[in-house]
Amino acid sequence: MQELRLVLILVGALAIAALLFHGLWTSRKETSSKFGKKVDIDFDSDVDDEQAAPMRGFDQPKEDVVVQKERKEPAFAREEVPTSDDPLFEGTVSSESNKFTQQEKPTVQQAQPQPQPQPVVQQVQEPTVGRIEPEAKPVAAPVKREEPTISFSAIDDEVLTQPEPVQAKVDIPETSTYLEPEIIIEEPEPEPEPELEEDVIVINVHGMGSDRFSGNRLFNSLEQNGLVFGDMAIYHRHSDLSGAGKVLFSVANMVSPGHFQVPEGEEFSTPGISFFLPLPCYGDAEHNFKLMLQTAQMISSELGGNVLDEKRDMLTPNKIDEYKQRVKVFCRK
């Protein structure tokens, strides 16, 4: 549909253009047929009349020189005037022909060119300058001048004895070297880290039910696991198995006042014992904690007891991890 519409529009536009062109062509043809019957006019006479008209009423002065050049006009052939049926055109043509026949061609006289006046050159006489003779000056009597005799030896002596030029001493001030003061930037002292509060890791070993640990059997188990009876009447684990060196952890009686009555032997008994590791401690805290846990488990298995936490509850893996986290805080320091 769109293509058909475009084709129709183009065809309509071409038809309108053809109609317009045909109308213009016919109107031109009619006008040319009406105005084509013109009388040939002698353009030479018209031009001559136009040039001669302004000169008829005036007398030209004789001094003016008029030079008329021959103009080469195109020659137009006379055509026969076609007869027209229109009475209006016949009247105009006849009147124009009569008018042109009545007019006479003016005669133009060629004036002889006069010689142009040559400019007069005036000669200017230059003024003559006379020689002025200087006045005669009185002549004075010649005076005899005695020229002094110059001895070169004296000049040489003077040259030799001339004092040497004295060089002026100029005190040049010493330039003082300006040293820029060193800028010392004091580094801020690190703030002291807050001291950690002391902590204590406690592991208890308790007898089964109402069982109690007897004295000799308990003391032998403690000594076999590297514990030594010492200060405060309790057992200690030292850095050296011989009992010398720093204390790593200690074992006390679960019953107050917490010390052991070793001399009593078989008469001594207790429901349980407590292992405790003070923090911070000597050496590696993690290593000391592992050693204390292993020792408590060994003694518990030998005596037939249970390993409990600080609240005397069963020691679970989660509780052991909590102990390890508390120990790591002191290991970083």
Curated annotation (Swiss-Prot):
The chain crosses the membrane at residues 6-26. Residues 27-333 are cytoplasmic. Coiled coil: none annotated. Residues 72-119 are annotated as: Disordered. GO terms for cellular component: cell division site; plasma membrane. It is found in: Cell inner membrane. Residues 72-81 have a biased composition (Basic and acidic residues). InterPro entries: Cell_div_ZipA, ZipA_FtsZ-bd_C, ZipA_FtsZ-bd_C_sf. Keywords: Cell cycle, Cell division, Cell inner membrane, Cell membrane, Membrane, Transmembrane, Transmembrane helix. Residues 1-5 are periplasmic. One of its GO terms (biological process) is division septum assembly. It is a single-pass type I membrane protein. SMART domains: ZipA_C. It comes from the Bacteria. Essential cell division protein that stabilizes the FtsZ protofilaments by cross-linking them and that serves as a cytoplasmic membrane anchor for the Z ring. Also required for the recruitment to the septal ring of downstream cell division proteins. NCBIfam families: septum_zipA (TIGR02205). This is Cell division protein ZipA. It comes from Aliivibrio fischeri (strain ATCC 700601 / ES114).
